[in-house]
Amino acid sequence: TSVVAAGMSYLIVPLLGDLNLTQDEAINALVIPGIGGLLLVFVAGVLGARFGERRTLGVAASTYFAGALLVAIAPDISLVTLGLLIVSCSGITLSIVSLSLLNSRISEPAQRATAFATLGVVAPAVFIAMPVLSGALTQFASWRWIPVLWAVLAVFVVLATIVFLRPVDRPSKRQEFVSPILAGLFLAAILQVLNNWPAGGLSSVRVWIPLAVACAAFVGFIYARNRVASPSLTLAPLRSRATTPLLIVAVLFPLANVFFYITMG
């Protein structure tokens, strides 16, 4: 996921010329995958718990591979957007299930600290290295080699999942998917409200429709949680003091790409 986020900036300018797009069309093609990722952000954790982390990681990495190849060979912006949507959704799943895997399989405090510290080193390293590599690629080759690089990395993830992760027998536990789906829909709708607000505020159809969807999703989420004894999505971690610095750190790295879009404007 960090690889895509770090290298995405270098797709915009080549896309404009290769597919004869306007700048707004290229930006929209990058916004839609983010919305799709938000829809799955809570469902991904439930998938790992329901089907097992090993199987979920393998399927997500394979789907990521297919999406990256679709971006690489896409002849028009609609297929590029579809490929980026697949990459975004499967990448979100990979990230969340990987964190869940670390948390469930490493119980020793010292080992867990080392594992999460290593994971914390990877993100800034990728955000430093990938823009340089992506920029170098676009200097002498087509932008389509960037998603090919994503596909190659997905192959390594599939192989690592098969080789290093052993299947774990767990008692089958029924998971409800309604509340995670509605929570993701709420986040995606709120993002659309914020994204379209400059177009005219509440007087704009592009604002009040997603706002209505967000309200309906929120009401449905509360109703779904109250209907089941053990909902799949819990808000308990948000009450922990340790959550705040983690959320701040998670936001800092993607903000690096904001400077690129500022220069585009």
Kindly give the residue locations of the regions a language model identified.
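Helix-loop-helix hairpins in multi-pass membrane proteins, especially solute transporters
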Residues: 34, 41-177
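Membrane-embedded alpha-helical segments in integral membrane proteins
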Residues: 4-14, 66-76, 124-139, 162, ...
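Generic signal for short, ordered secondary-structure residues
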Residues: 5, 26-27, 81, 116, ...
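12-transmembrane solute porter fold
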Residues: 1-33, 37-45, 54-57, 61-62, ...
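Membrane-interfacial loop-to-transmembrane-helix junctions in polytopic alpha-helical membrane proteins
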Residues: 22-25, 79, 112, 171, ...
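A short alpha-helix capping/helix-coil boundary motif
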Residues: 22-25, 48, 112-115, 120, ...
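Hydrophobic transmembrane-helix bundles of small-molecule transporters
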Residues: 117, 135, 139-250
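Short charge-dense sequence patches
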Residues: 13-15, 31-36, 52-54, 85, ...
